From Swiss-Prot:
It is found in: Cytoplasm. The gene is clpB. ATP 2 binds at residues 611-618. GO terms for molecular function: ATP binding; ATP hydrolysis activity. Part of a stress-induced multi-chaperone system, it is involved in the recovery of the cell from heat-induced damage, in cooperation with DnaK, DnaJ and GrpE. Acts before DnaK, in the processing of protein aggregates. Protein binding stimulates the ATPase activity; ATP hydrolysis unfolds the denatured protein aggregates, which probably helps expose new hydrophobic binding sites on the surface of ClpB-bound aggregates, contributing to the solubilization and refolding of denatured protein aggregates by DnaK. Homohexamer. The oligomerization is ATP-dependent. This is Chaperone protein ClpB.
Amino acid sequence: MDLQKFTQQVQQTIADAQNLAIASEHQEIDVIHVFKVLLTESDFAKRAYDVAEVNVEALQKVVDESLRKIPVVSGSGVNYGQAMSQALFQLMRDAEKEQKQLDDDFVSTEHLILAVMDQKSNPITVELKKQNKSKKQINEAILKIRGGKKVTSQNAEENYEALTKYGRDLVAEVRSGKLDPVIGRDAEIRNVIRILSRKTKNNPVLIGEPGVGKTAIVEGLAQRIVRKDVPEGLKDKTIISLDIGSLIAGAKYRGEFEERLKAVLQEVKQSDGQILLFIDEIHTIVGAGKTDGAMDAGNMLKPMLARGELHCIGATTLDEYRQYIEKDAALERRFQKVLVPEPTVEDTVSILRGLKERFEIHHGVNIHDNALVAAASLSNRYITDRFLPDKAIDLVDEACATIRVEIDSMPSELDEVTRKVMQLEIEEAALKEEKDPASERRLEMLQRELADYKEEANKMKSKWESEKSEISKIREVREQIDHLRHELEEAENNYDLNKAAELRHGKIPAVEKELLALETENREKTAQEDRILQEEVTENEIAEIVGRWTGIPVTKLVEGEREKLLKLADVLHQKVIGQDDAVQLVSDAVLRARAGIKDPKRPIGSFIFLGPTGVGKTELAKALAYNMFDSEDHMIRIDMSEYMEKHSVSRLVGAPPGYVGYEEGGQLTEAVRRNPYSIVLLDEIEKAHPDVFNILLQVLDDGRITDSQGRLIDFKNTVIIMTSNIGSNLLLERTEEGEISPELESDVMQILQSEFKPEFLNRVDDIILFKPLTLADIKGIVEKLVEELQIRLADQEITITISDNAKAFIAEEAYDPVYGARPLKRYIVRHVETPLAREIVSGKIMPHSSVEIDLQDKEFTFKVTE
């Protein structure tokens, strides 16, 4: 018996049968062991018996029973599973005879299945006879599966019914109602039909960005085939979507993948043009299976495509088409391109309206039309790195899922009451142990309170459950309508006019009437009373999801946020002292953006802050970030002194291809891509190389920039602040009592214009001059710094108060108009914080104490009170 004459699956079956015999402590490998393995592991054996209409479960029971009857030999030195039984030898010899009869090159699984029928006393044959199955019937089933193929390779079993194994029948899926409806895209579908109807080169390839609906076009074609809304040549055709993953998966040996693909192509060829093969992500076929000098899968397609034996529809993205298919001119020539553009916002709304019902049925919610319009427009405006309609469909789906989760989980109000009941029950159990009068009185009060809470919890629970059941009932009726409509479509396609008339004029209107009554009743109840559950998906839910994905607040302004925005200028005035004009201009820009009246094609605001060092330019940017986002993390700070050389400019948008760091992206572009709603602070811009400003031109004008990877980065939701010290010497010398004269402003602007190009300055919203700080401003800053120190000491519960004399002394001593507020910080650290720290460490100032800081003979004194 030559094992090389067996297919790999038969060889594996014998090896597994031996392992089974060893595990079961059987001395010999028998036919029963082989069939136990075949019935559990071989897809072909199960399929053959299924086609022959054998009761496989009954057969498996017989095999298991027979296995249990084989005697178990135990003891030391026993060799398990080392010999083949006489019956198994006979089976192998009979299988070889079957192989010769069928004119095959190798012994495969089907020969074993046929050979066992010659062993009349074998339990398997006895069971099959009991089920009235003859060898002839099983042989017919095998020939049906083989479809005229011979066993010419050691992987033969892998290649039977290849299309069923490695593909999905889209037309069958449409008939069973598994696919969503395809709305629009009529021009592209017509184009595909036109190409498919050609005599030669009748292979369209759909090219478009990811998410624009390439696969949906093929699904739309399948739906048209089912509706018979196609030319005569395409009627009754089948579209098989090839699953590349399952085609490649498990192909262990060289050539196995090609063999599977060849089997698929052979089946398509034998169908005489009845099967249209759809290969999604067709670029994966080009080069698949290619090893040194080996022929790849793409080359296997070429001859069949050229001869018109293969009707193929491909789909791939623009980048991958260029990268893989355009390089292979011979393959590209055999395909006809169909460009699939991104749909407009209006088209996307139509697509969403068509899918609305499917989402409502799946999630059991009610979607408002304004939610669909919001999904299309907001996704187009804020989610710039993806394409319509995919991103809009995802938004609607996630908003529906959010509402569904809220319906299914316990409402927060009920959850609170339930927790309160649990807390009181624990307290009650503890008080029952106490016997003193005070505890008994407390117990009595607690029991009354507990009874009230329990009653409230029960009321809320019953209300929640009744609302939930109402929503479920509406969902069930919607599902029923969907099922009836699908039946109607099927009846019309099959020309079953009686059934179609009964459904159209009888069943469907009756169920629709029931749904209308339920929805009306539900709406009336909602209007009359406060509902615990919300089942409506509105534009607010969509805006919330956009905010969650991008970090950009697009929801309608709530009361708390209105207050915060209106008071933004006042809050910034407290943080940045003495720069009223700058604060007002920045807060106005944020206000315009949040009210939705800013130019949607430009950043929220772009400013140049000019002024001497230490007057609050960077501090204002930090304060704005803190007030807009409650943290300074949303501020992207880039020190322009790092971009002084020409070659360092590329670091902003990423290194060019071929250079180190190309994959990492740019420091500015990556930061904004991850955080599209943020403040971009470009510190000390006069230190940067002039080429940096060329990059910033389109950012300031169009709110967008292309990084080194070719991605479009959106700056439309950023505040761009640039700081500079240009003209600070003039501001220091000629500012009178904190006011900047028009002449001084004009002189500073002239210096600025000599430093920067006019096209750069012209694109900035505002150039703001920061005034040098006066002594009065410095006193205000002392207050602020003392407050910050107080916050740092709050952890140790130490409170400090500082006398007016001490504050005035600090302001006078530390005031230097040239250096602004920074010397003030240094002075407080040296003369207040350091002595204070020494007192705390020495134990003179303990936690929970108050410290009064005063001035005596130009020295600071610390008076501690408990």
